[in-house]
């Protein structure tokens, strides 16, 4: 593996600005069927991107940033609550619904992504996906 190079010393790096809470059009760029390390529950992990064209006019994401990337985990146990959440996720992206879902069907599809401000593990504010909705 090669060395990672940066234009400035990473010791001087500051936390990036957080995308403000709101609704943005975004696209699913990757989808994976996984098992949660902490609980052992099956889940669908979606990688969602919001392009800079959707950012508020007064939001400066920093030099060279053309999109914000988020991860959405949808627990997929075969219980009523998880089936309901999966239904709403499929509906948001226009993915066909049946008793089996192909994660690949999400890739390339768009939805409204509702961003909220949560906290990271160190209690710092962090933009995160609160909900996905149909366009």
Give names to the regions the model predicted.
Residues 1-135:
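Short beta-rich binding modules
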């Amino acid at each position: 593996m090669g060395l990672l190079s940066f234009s400035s010393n990473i010791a001087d790096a500051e936390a990036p600005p957080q995308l403000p809470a709101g609704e943005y059009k975004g696209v699913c760029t990757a989808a994976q069927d996984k098992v949660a390390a902490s609980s052992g529950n099956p889940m669908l992990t979606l990688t969602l991107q919001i392009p800079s064209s959707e950012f508020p006019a007064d939001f400066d994401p920093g030099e060279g940033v053309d999109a914000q990337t988020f991860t959405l985990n949808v627990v997929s146990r075969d219980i009523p609550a998880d089936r309901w959440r999966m239904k709403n996720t499929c509906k948001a992206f226009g993915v066909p619904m049946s008793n089996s879902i192909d994660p690949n069907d999400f890739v390339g599809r768009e939805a409204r992504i509702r961003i909220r401000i949560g906290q990271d593990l160190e209690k710092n504010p962090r933009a995160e996906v609160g909900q996905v909705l149909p366009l």
